[in-house]
Design a protein with these regions (language model features):
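Short beta-strand edge/turn micro-motifs at domain boundaries
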Residues: 29, 33-35, 39-43, 162-171, ...
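Short, low-complexity N-terminal intrinsically disordered segments enriched in polar/charged residues
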Residues: 27-101
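A solvent-exposed, acidic/Ser-Thr-rich amphipathic alpha-helical stretch
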Residues: 93-173
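Classical Sec-dependent N-terminal signal peptides that target proteins to the secretory pathway
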Residues: 1-23
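Short, cysteine-centered beta-strand-loop-beta hairpins and adjacent loop/turn segments enriched
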Residues: 137, 176-187, 215-216
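Residues that flank catalytic or metal-binding motifs in active/ligand-binding sites
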Residues: 73-76, 103-105, 144-146, 188-192, ...
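Short beta-strand segments enriched in hydrophobic/aromatic residues
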Residues: 81, 103, 174-176, 209-212
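Short, solvent-exposed loop/turn segments that connect beta-strands within catalytic domains
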Residues: 87-92, 156-166, 181-184, 200-204
Length: 222
């Protein structure tokens, strides 16, 4: 066979082989690219889900702590009110200090119920005056806080899970015992309807409405 013809055949086979190898590489490249893209997407999804779980855990912890702190406001109020019912200056000063700590300066408070003329007071000093004047003629008192329900309306946290802003409603059942002269006791049942907000690093009550449900005067030691 002519040498030129053989060279042409060999050259053709070589070019055909090169072309086939190039096509094979081109066919694999999209698949490999797709696999790489899928792997990257899965990594991004995992990171996103991880961040969401992290944020959710932070928010759950913040809501739990907020609920405890909000409930404690009304409990401290009950304790402070009992202190104000005592006659010694030290107890009155402690009760007043707690009021300043749990109430916001723009406090709006009221007392209402069946057979009672609604009383409204503005500011901490206004409510403090009403309480001290009401409890003054009585003996020791005991304000018991029962069932409490917290409804968080708004809650914002920073990147570290710290609360920076919040609004909530607080409902607390009340049972209050007030000693009277002649071995008598005045028992009152009611509900505190309070609104609280988070500002300056703490929760405070800015609105509190005391609803009297029922009351009676009893003779002790009968």
């Amino acid at each position: 066979m002519n040498t030129k013809i053989l060279l042409c055949i060999y050259l053709g086979l070589f070019l055909f082989t090169v072309a086939m190898m190039t096509d094979s590489k081109n066919e694999r490249s999209p698949l490999e690219s797709t696999k790489q893209h899928a792997g990257w997407a899965q990594e991004q999804l995992a990171m996103t889900n991880g961040n969401k779980l992290y944020d959710t855990a932070f928010m759950a912890g913040a809501r739990h702590q907020a609920t405890l702190d909000i409930e404690y406001l009304q409990r401290r109020y009950a304790y402070a009110t009992d202190l104000l019912g005592l006659t010694d200056p030290s107890s009155i000063a402690r009760g007043n200090s707690i009021y300043q700590d749990i109430f916001s300066e723009d406090l709006q408070a009221s007392f209402f119920g069946p057979g009672v003329d609604t009383i409204k007071k503005s500011g901490i000093s206004g409510w403090l005056e009403l309480v001290t004047n009401s409890l003054g003629p009585m003996g020791p008192t005991q304000h018991l806080i029962g069932t409490q329900l917290v409804d968080i309306k708004e809650l914002e946290i920073d990147d570290f899970g710290n609360i920076v802003k919040g609004e909530a409603l607080l409902r607390s059942y009340l049972q209050a015992w007030h000693t009277l002269p002649d071995q008598k006791v005045w028992l009152a049942l009611g509900t505190y309807h309070s609104k609280v907000r988070f500002s300056d690093g703490r929760w405070k009550i800015w609105q509190m409405n005391l609803e009297l449900t029922v009351d009676e005067t009893r003779q002790m030691n009968d």
